[in-house]
Regions:
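Bacterial Sec-dependent signal peptides at the C-terminal "C-region" and cleavage site
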Residues: 2, 12-22
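Extended ligand-binding groove/face enriched in aromatic
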Residues: 271-273, 315-463
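Loop/turn residues immediately N-terminal
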Residues: 58-62, 107-111, 152-156, 193-197, ...
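Well-ordered alpha-helical scaffold segments within catalytic/enzyme domains
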Residues: 295-310, 382, 397-414, 460, ...
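Terminal, non-catalytic domain-edge segments
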Residues: 225, 235-236, 241-261, 524-707
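Short coil-to-beta transitions that initiate beta-strands within beta-rich domains
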Residues: 30-49, 73-98, 123-144, 167-184, ...
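Long, well-ordered core segments of solenoidal/helical folds
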Residues: 249-276, 317-333, 421-440, 486-507, ...
């Protein structure tokens, strides 16, 4: 797998222009086990011999031949001996030669040998800390000649004159060390009882969980001449390479990944892995939100087409549009979008799985679960099953995509008419049925009710802001795409009679915690994108811009590149409107002549944090399997102590989310502050590359990052 990936990168490197070759490091993990010749034993020791890693278990040694491990003559386990250490030094844990002197790490201290029988205790200190180190289990010398220690108190670097000490406050994630090794260009790797840590330019990269290693308990590690680190654990060997790659090469990789393993009849969705963690064992899967996921992929390809003029991008955007339209055309009533379409002979008996008994079981724990059967009705032609009980998630995705497609991709009359037709059908369905999705049982779907009656009831009060805003957004998209004035007239009625625009100013619940679900951030921001982009009334634009800011203040530190891109794109438009002078207080809220100028100036100052977009795009792993990652043990985090907050929520000491490659999120609608998380499907599912593609191309389109 690793060799195939490296060949893929080589082929990519000759396919892009020089302006596209701004490179960054992409970490890639390979797990070695019985398939490549290793026994199922703990890997205890590692050395580099002739630039090849050689490992030892308790009874055997193996050398890497490039494709397989070969049993070789037993290499004795490394033993360290330091004579005449002070009696109170405790157990000798590590040892290294520093400037021609032996440095010994012990359970009770750090020592340097000044003469044959003379050991002096080292007490590291800098401007922040003064240590008497304990359990100094890791020592190494980097390529610049610095001494590094890993101790109970943290990590230290000594240049021969001064110390620099690192704890959780400086970003050190963990401190139960087992080993250390020097890499290239001053890089240092530490092994711990919970993963491996790379220190590069005083920044700590934490590599733990099955995403990076076969097991978290690292016994030993070593770095070869290319900078590859080989990591011995209790359950096999891990290998991590840092390879140079460009953003465009990464986009090409994820487009291919999505097309190869996630395209089912034009629908994009997570797949299923018959063998856990083995992407080659995939089979195409379905989700509850095929329409939303296909829409988001189509939006990514639309932005790609706008940025690059790539013919493939237009082809994929068109295919996505046709797939989304098919979801709408196949159902019982015009304009009702299905969640999923599958062949009548699909491998799973879905209506037996989603039986009446299934519904009753769900209602015991969820009183709002809808009892509808069949959940997969048969299409009129008898060839397909389609999933009902469609949610607001689907509609948010559909309308988000349709507006973007219409603006950036639709060029021919046929393309324009196709998107006009599907927007008209869905919007007319909502209006005709009292602003709700009416299912085949004649009732509203569980999550598809945008009616005034629902929004102003005990059942919908917590969704009032979001659903009111979404309905106005749908109508704005419909007005823009179709040009039919009836949709603006309908929106005006909802505003004047039911205050939907006032509700929209608080479009997302962020407290109490029990009302907070992260995917509503997607619904909110995707709908605000259509609402604000197509709104013509300056007073409403000011109100909706305030709603956007409220949402942003609650999510801005989660390092979600997609959310940053939406916020940045909408703020750009607002600032342009301010420059055009459309918020003239003579006409905009004239009852308070100070309000419009004040809000215009306030909301013209914005920061979508392009640095967070770039960091996240760089660090999104190429492996999108849903590994469980538990960060609650880290030294560099703070737990969210908000009353009512569920366990396992928090952020790093800098108040921002843990980097994306150190948490379990591989979808765009997850909570970046979830320190303990396993993606849906876990190791038995791979997520699609839209996770990278949509924020990347959207950020490029809005000039939030440069190619």
């Amino acid at each position: 797998m690793k060799q195939a990936f490296l060949l893929f990168l080589i082929l990519l490197s000759v396919s892009f222009t020089e302006t596209e070759k701004i490179e960054f490091k992409q970490d890639v993990s390979t797990i070695h086990g019985i398939k490549v010749g290793l026994p199922e034993e703990p890997i205890l020791d590692l050395i580099i011999k002739n630039n090849r890693p050689v490992l030892s278990t308790k009874t055997q040694s193996f050398e890497w031949g490039g494709k397989r491990w070969t049993n070789v003559k037993r290499i004795k386990n490394k033993k360290i001996v330091a004579k005449n250490l002070p009696e109170d030094a405790g157990e000798l844990l590590s040892m290294v030669n520093f400037n021609d002197k032996i440095v010994a790490g012990c359970s009770n201290g750090l020592y340097i040998q000044e003469a044959r029988n003379i050991w002096n205790r080292i007490l590291p200190s800098d401007k922040n800390y003064s240590w008497s180190p304990k359990n100094v289990a890791a020592l190494t010398i980097d390529t610049k000649g610095n001494l590094w220690i890993g101790a109970e108190q943290g990590v230290g670097r000594f240049n021969g004159e001064t110390w620099k000490l690192f704890t959780g406050n400086e970003g050190l994630p963990y401190n139960h060390f087992t080993s250390a090794a020097a890499g290239l260009n001053g890089i240092v790797w530490f092994g711990t009882e919970k993963g491996a840590i790379r220190v590069e330019n005083d920044y700590f990269y934490y590599r733990f969980s099955r995403r990076w290693l076969p097991d978290d308990h690292v016994n030993d590690l070593v770095v070869d001449e290319s900078g590859t680190v080989w990591i011995g654990t209790n359950k096999g060997l891990g290998q991590i390479d840092s390879k140079e790659i460009t953003f465009e090469e990464k986009a090409f990789f994820f487009t291919k990944q999505t097309e190869d393993r996630h395209n089912r009849m034009g629908f994009i969705a997570p797949n299923e892995l018959k063998e856990p963690y083995n992407k080659a064992s995939y089979q195409l899967g379905i989700s509850d939100n095929d329409g939303m996921y296909t829409s988001m992929y189509g939006a990514a390809q639309s932005f790609r087409y706008a940025v690059n003029g790539d013919k493939e991008a237009k082809k994929l955007a068109n295919r996505s549009l046709k797939a989304c339209k098919w979801l709408v055309d196949i159902t019982h009533e015009s304009g009702f979008p299905a969640r999923v379409i599958i062949p009548i002979d699909y491998r799973e008996p879905v209506n037996e799985i989603y039986s009446r008994e299934y519904n009753k079981r769900n209602q015991r724990s969820d009183p709002f679960w809808k009892d509808i059967y069949p959940r997969f009705p048969t299409s009129e032609d008898g060839k397909y099953l389609w999933k009902c009980d469609t949610s607001s998630d689907e509609l948010a995705g559909h309308y988000f995509f349709y507006g973007i497609y219409y603006d950036l991709v639709a060029e021919t009359d046929e393309e324009k008419e196709m998107v006009k037709e599907v927007v008209r059908d869905i919007t007319d369905h909502l209006i005709r049925n009292g602003f709700l999705l009416r299912d085949h049982d004649g009732k509203s779907t569980r999550w598809g009710n945008f009616s005034p009656e629902f929004c102003n009831s005990i059942w919908g009060w917590d969704q009032r802001g979001l659903n009111s805003m979404m309905m106005l957004s749908f109508l704005n998209v419909a007005t823009h795409v179709t040009g039919d004035p009836k949709y603006e007239e309908t929106a005006e009625m909802l505003r004047e009679k039911y205050n939907y625009h006032i509700n929209a100013m608080h479009a997302k619940e962020f407290f109490p915690p029990e009302n907070v679900v992260p995917w509503d951030n997607n619904l909110s921001l995707m709908s605000l994108y259509g609402l604000i982009n197509y709104e013509q009334d300056p007073e409403l634009l000011l109100m909706y811009r305030e709603s956007l800011e409220y949402a942003w203040l609650n999510i801005s530190k989660q390092k979600n590149a997609f959310w940053n891109a939406i916020y940045g794109g909408l703020c750009q438009k607002f600032s342009q409107d301010v420059e055009l002078g459309i918020f003239n207080s003579e006409f905009v809220f004239p009852e308070n002549e100070l309000y419009a100028p004040f809000k215009s100036e306030l909301f013209s100052n914005w920061d979508a944090r392009s640095e967070d977009i770039l960091e996240t795009l760089e660090r999104i792993p190429l492996d999108l399997i849903g590994y469980e990652m538990d960060n609650t043990h880290r030294l560099d985090i703070q737990i969210d102590e908000t009353p009512g907050q569920k366990k396992g929520m928090g952020w790093r000491n800098d108040s921002y989310a843990v980097p994306v490659d150190e948490r379990g999120h591989v979808r765009l609608d997850r909570d970046g502050f979830a320190l303990l998380y396993r993606e849906v499907g876990g190791g038995k599912s791979e997520q699609e590359g839209t996770f990278y593609l949509l924020p990347y191309y959207m950020s490029l389109y809005h000039n939030l990052i440069q190619k």
